[in-house]
Amino acid sequence: PQITGKTASGQKWDISSWGDTFGNRSERYLAAVAYLDGARPSMVFARGYYTGPEGETGGRTVIATYDLVDGKLVKKWRFDTMDYNNQYIGQGNHSMSVADVDYDGCDELIYGSLAINNDGKPMYSTGLGHGDAQHVSDLDTSRPGLEVYSCHEETQAKYSFEMRDARTGEILVGGEQMGSDNGRGTSDDIDPRYPGCEGWSAAGILTAADGTVISTKYTMPANFLCYWDGDLGREVQDNIYISKWNPEKEKVETIFTASGCTSVNGTKANPSLTADLFGDWREEVMYPLKDGSALRIYTTTTPTSYKIPTLMHDIQYRMHVAYQNDC
């Protein structure tokens, strides 16, 4: 069908009490696309991820999913923390990840410290509460299945950052509570000396997938990632810079600067978009110009000897590109 940008259908929000109304904490919305039935994409909309750790009143999270049938939105299911107890309140992050964590052919939702099955039923909650960032992938290649790496704001949580089994919620690696808001966290393969993906956060600790501490000397940017040069490791993206981890010097070194551009999303300093747009598996980066007059897309000029199908053919990657466009 022709894409016009016109609204196809809509639903009114049911406005009610959402606990803590400090700032806009009760008005936090998320969206994603997920293959909940394993066959066709569904729309996922959510509200609420702050307040209400176990034993505290207030706070609410609702996730509603819809299919577009004959041009109309048809509700698939709705998850509401008011139907359960406090263990599911206040567990969300600034985005929800989409992945088939139990290998049943259908996507599940990783909602911060909470996981929701493709049928709308809760799978688990770690109870570690809200955090800004999370990454879901095969982070530890020595064990089956997917893992989640997440940082946490709650100082009463046991860990400031952790890596867990994405299906069961079992904590595999836990970072000591630092006593303050650990607001950034990132995980990917940046150090070729260690198998799997490394993890780092605002706590200033770089760990291997098995929990081995690689470095505590340097607080590395933990905002975003990018495949940019020709090797199979990931690069670190922060603000208008792309950098590469130097294991010998234990710091990142800038390899690209988007001159004349600016980042978006405040202190998160993101690009407008990072994705494999042109299909050679390295990723393009999109930034607004400083004067806001246009968007500029950059692509790498570095040759590579690796031939990999375009990343957009990986369904989890494609769904993640979609949900990265909300916060």
Language-model regions: role of each:
Residues 1-327:
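Beta-propeller-forming repeat regions
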